[in-house]
């Protein structure tokens, strides 16, 4: 646990969770830690000697280049280094050596960038990503980096030796690495010459580059002579230094149309202390000499957290809460299946198929339809047979509203449906009332009081709160633990994706799951307790607790369709691919025989040479690929590193193309660009990647046998399945082939079954497109409509431009709401036998496999 916990965290839910965490540490055999292990790895001394470059042309072609090389190894240093600038030369030589100490547990990728210096701005000629794990100990290696049919080249010499620094212990799950965290605490006082309060306009600033904390300007205390405290947390592997700066605040007068005083900072002097030189757990005092005979006294103490002292979970198995839920839910599902399938006796727990129900995105249309689909499953007695219930965007609004009731699935759904109808069918003008605006302002001030700024996504969450409740909703996601504690309801999984700047969700998206117990990334095997989502973590340790956000803010994030870029808007709404943008992207060359080398050593990364885009091209890309808005959340993986062999881990689920992609800046093969290197998460609507949360239920640990997919979108009836099939094929995930007759794409049926008879690990998929087919003529399964009123009720358009159920339609007439709920319910009831057949297939697979399959 962190060294200091906030008092609010210790109250309420914090204390039970604290006890649970302490208990976990005493149970070494606990299954949820089976993928986390402690390892000891050595340090290595790496010497990088930048020799020379050849055939470098100046960008303006009127003079020769002024070249320098920038080196950046973020796993071993806190900031980039660079050579001197060699002016007016097409063939510059440097012969400069840069030493690094690298840790053997992490993937150390060196970035080398050749620049042509300009008066206004330096031009990046090309950049290189070099995996240092390819080097042999004690054997100097000279690399000539170039690309085919390009005369430009850079020559660099590498030497790798064992270090005299003792090996250190880390914690890893095979994808991420957590180092011990170094904490520096201390006080600063003026010494013999002056106290801090006597520095006048001068100010002392402390900074540790690479630390979690920002530079800290020290303000005198209210009582003269009292010391000023400081704290820094940093990775000791980076050889960090404490910088003490004496600065002066100057008031500069500007003459002109508006004569104003402007504060400017002038650096007067600077001193540094190497933090690795400090003894651990010992208090010591250092006198630092600054300008004009000033001395500052620093009383400091350094301590190191143990490598295993983490406040997040590193592992690829299911958390305790979900495991306990499954044990109880299987008993409920066994009895339900016995009733529905007419079995002579209840199933053994290992024979109970795992059924997941998925709801697609689609705004109010999806939310309303899911109520009807769940009502149909409940009427068939199948809701108790469902293990997981997951949704994207609008479907998540339905699910999260249902889970306000701890026993919602044990009651008739007419009550929740009526509640939803009253809100969907009412006027939304109240969200613009003075009272509501005062509420928005109050929430905004509350955010700002905690040091946050409210984003448009957060404001959207408050609007969704009004839309769903028309009053303040105090509920939090962790409250839903009560709804699954006895296995009484399906386990809810809410979906979002983490995106990176200037990359579409189609090209790169990291699925993030939200459950009552945990929030985390299956890709990294990194999870935090739901109560701690939004708090500040560094190197796996909780540094600052913030209260868990109310669920309305999560609902805004899960349904943040407006966070699209122009590129995604054209792609999703118009079906247009802006291929001309490819001309404005930089190019990538893999400079070694990558396919052959990957077979020999799957842990190594290819050497990549990037030719960056021009400033104009960057501006064009920014216009089309920057997101209109995107909420940012504290990154709980910040400060963790990628494991040395992460590329060979099956748990790190990425496309095989990622390792040899020529897509500029594709992050998975560039560990320095991956999420643990970021300060914040950018979480948006999962529909930007796949408009249904298939990736979250396809994890092998969940061993899902049958997926019941409800697609409420306005996209093609099989598009979400086809996108999922490609996603799975690219990543080696078992999934059935989606083969449909072209006629079905034009005029789809109500239900389709997809299964791979030869692959029992592939889930059975039962897919329900949202169509008005037999419902138009039938009041109920097998009962035709008779009266004009009955026929009129069933005669409506569900898809196309003339539908009343568009993505931007948030208010329905009562008749429109009833039609959509009734249609969705009917489509389930009318396919009772197909559902039973799918369940029978899942049961047969379980029996043939002797229990668990898919895992």
UniProtKB/Swiss-Prot annotation:
Main location class: cytoplasm
Enzyme Commission identifier(s): 3.1.1.4
Active site: 393 (nucleophile), 685 (proton acceptor)
Activity regulation comment: Stimulated by cytosolic Ca(2+).
GO cellular component, one term: cytoplasm
UniProt: Ca(2+) 2 binding residues: 60, 116, 118, 123
Domain C2 as annotated: residue spans: 27-145
Entry keyword Metal-binding: yes
Cofactor(s) of this protein: Ca(2+)
GO biological process, one term: prostaglandin biosynthetic process
Key words of the record: Calcium, Cell membrane, Cytoplasm, Hydrolase, Lipid degradation, Lipid metabolism, Membrane, Metal-binding, Mitochondrion, Phospholipid degradation, Phospholipid metabolism
Domain remark from Swiss-Prot or TrEMBL: The N-terminal C2 domain associates with lipid membranes upon calcium binding. It modulates enzyme activity by presenting the active site to its substrate in response to elevations of cytosolic Ca(2+).
Function comment: Has calcium-dependent phospholipase and lysophospholipase activities with a potential role in membrane lipid remodeling and biosynthesis of lipid mediators. Preferentially hydrolyzes the ester bond of the fatty acyl group attached at sn-2 position of phospholipids (phospholipase A2 activity). Selectively hydrolyzes sn-2 arachidonoyl group from membrane phospholipids, providing the precursor for eicosanoid biosynthesis.
Protein name: Cytosolic phospholipase A2 zeta
